[in-house]
């Protein structure tokens, strides 16, 4: 690919009009939460900056991040791959394989040393000297370190690369390890989720290309624009949570009415992600809207925290409109308040059900005549 070609030149070559290009820039600004006023700056960057070479490598993973990325709609994955960046190496998507693919890998990291972005999907297992994950005939950890050495920045795609995910579940026999525990001398942005939201993945790349830097992150390395609030904060069922209206079983009347799924194990109150605002499948829905509680797949350690259907009792990151950076100091008080709210809500709910039941007097023989 010609990396000196700009994004705008690539789009024009594909027959995209100037008007459509500007509409694309406006949409990109909106998806990044920057407002329409930033569209001209994005347009200037995409008109003048050459496409950035990207090397995308895979460790221990299931490829769900790639599957998610190619379904991006804002912007389209094809626009990102063919125009916005130069995805020169991805052994899942590229046509080449085997020795030919590895020659491309070596050429890119040598020719663009210090200029390319390294995207990592999956994590390196450190057990048995890395032999649990072999890439190109050698342990993946070696490939990761070699690729990271010349990268300008690193994107950790998904919960596997960010936290370890199910591969790191106790007792973690392969010693699966998040990449930031192995690569410590490069800027790393974490985009957790199993998988991450497609449009979030595309937006992160668009931001980096436009502004030549990583987006602002929280103390855990996640971009604040997408991981600054909990799913619970913008969930459309939040009003039912505040009112103490909860689903008690999957087939009860509350479930049919769309009440809060907290008591069914929903991890939305402790999970930072954009599911409730960005949604999935081009904004169609997200798990809670489909009737199932959040699994908390974007959070560190979700795989070792018991059943998906167990109610969250200990909420270490509680805070109504706080980010992960600020909730720690207030978590204890908020947890106590939350316990009180649920106790009151449950009491009110039980009293309401009791009042709806007929009394014993109403069922006594002959009582109908007395009431008449």
Swiss-Prot record:
Enumerate the Gene Ontology biological process terms: anaerobic respiration
Regions of this protein lying in the Cytoplasmic compartment: 347-372
Residues assigned to the Periplasmic compartment are: 46-325
What reaction does this catalyse?
A: H2 + A = AH2
Q: What cofactor is this protein dependent on?
A: [4Fe-4S] cluster; [3Fe-4S] cluster
User: Residue span of the signal peptide, if any?
Assistant: 1-45
InterPro entries named in the record: Cytochrome-c3_hydrogenase_C, NADH_UbQ_OxRdtase-like_20kDa, NiFe-Hase_small_C_sf, NiFe_Hase_small_N_sf, NiFe_hydrogenase_ssu, TAT_signal, TAT_signal_bac_arc
Q: Which domain of life is it from?
A: Bacteria
Task: Tell me which EC number(s) this protein carries.
Answer: 1.12.99.6
Compartments where found:
Cell inner membrane
Question: Which post-translational modifications are recorded for this protein?
Answer: Predicted to be exported by the Tat system. The position of the signal peptide cleavage has not been experimentally proven.
Q: Name one GO cellular component term.
A: [Ni-Fe] hydrogenase complex
GO MF, any single term: electron transfer activity
Coiled-coil boundaries: none
Transmembrane intervals: 326-346
- Which UniProt keywords are given for this protein, alphabetically ordered? 3Fe-4S, 4Fe-4S, Cell inner membrane, Cell membrane, Iron, Iron-sulfur, Membrane, Metal-binding, Oxidoreductase, Signal, Transmembrane, Transmembrane helix
List of residues binding [4Fe-4S] cluster 2: 232, 235, 260, 266
Instruction: Please list the residues that bind [4Fe-4S] cluster 1.
Output: 62, 65, 160, 194
Binding positions ([3Fe-4S] cluster): 275, 294, 297
Chain residue ranges for the region called Disordered: 346-372
Q: How does it sit in the membrane?
A: Single-pass type I membrane protein
Give the cofactor note: Binds 2 [4Fe-4S] clusters. Binds 1 [3Fe-4S] cluster.
What does the similarity note say?
Belongs to the [NiFe]/[NiFeSe] hydrogenase small subunit family.
Which NCBIfam families has this protein been placed in?
hydA (TIGR00391), TAT_signal_seq (TIGR01409)
Q: What is the name attached to this protein's record?
A: Hydrogenase-1 small chain
């Amino acid at each position: 690919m010609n990396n000196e070609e700009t994004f705008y030149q690539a789009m024009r070559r594909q027959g995209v009009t100037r008007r459509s290009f500007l509409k694309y820039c406006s949409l990109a600004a909106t998806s990044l939460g920057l407002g329409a006023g930033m569209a001209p700056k994005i347009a200037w960057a995409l008109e003048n900056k050459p496409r950035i070479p990207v090397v995308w490598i895979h460790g221990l993973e299931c490829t769900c991040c790639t599957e998610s990325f190619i379904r991006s709609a804002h912007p389209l994955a094809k626009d990102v791959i063919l125009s916005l960046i130069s995805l020169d190496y991805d052994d899942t998507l590229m046509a080449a394989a085997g020795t030919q693919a590895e020659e491309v890998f070596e050429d890119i990291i040598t020719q663009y040393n210090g200029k390319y972005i390294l995207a990592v999907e999956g994590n390196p297992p450190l057990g048995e000297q890395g032999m649990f994950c072999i890439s190109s005939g050698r342990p993946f950890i070696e490939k990761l370190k070699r690729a990271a050495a010349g990268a300008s920045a690193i994107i950790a795609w998904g919960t596997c690369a960010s936290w370890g995910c199910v591969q790191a579940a106790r007792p973690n026999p392969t010693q699966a390890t998040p990449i930031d525990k192995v690569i410590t001398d490069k800027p790393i942005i974490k985009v957790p989720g199993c998988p991450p939201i497609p449009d979030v993945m595309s937006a992160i790349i668009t931001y980096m290309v436009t502004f030549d830097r990583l987006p602002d992150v929280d103390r855990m390395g996640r971009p604040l624009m997408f991981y600054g609030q909990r799913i619970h904060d913008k969930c459309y069922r939040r009003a039912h949570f505040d009112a103490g209206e909860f689903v008690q079983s999957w087939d009860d009347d509350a479930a049919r009415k769309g009440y809060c799924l907290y008591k069914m194990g929903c991890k939305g109150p402790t999970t930072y992600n954009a599911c409730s605002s960005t949604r999935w499948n081009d904004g169609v829905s997200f798990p809670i809207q489909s009737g199932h509680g959040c699994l908390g797949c974007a959070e560190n350690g979700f795989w070792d925290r018991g059943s998906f259907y167990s109610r969250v009792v200990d909420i270490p990151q509680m805070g109504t409109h706080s980010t992960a950076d600020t909730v720690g100091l207030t978590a204890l008080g908020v947890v106590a308040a939350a316990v009180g709210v649920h106790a009151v809500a449950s009491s009110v709910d039980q009293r309401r059900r009791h009042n709806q039941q007929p009394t014993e007097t109403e069922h006594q023989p002959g009582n109908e005549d007395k009431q008449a």
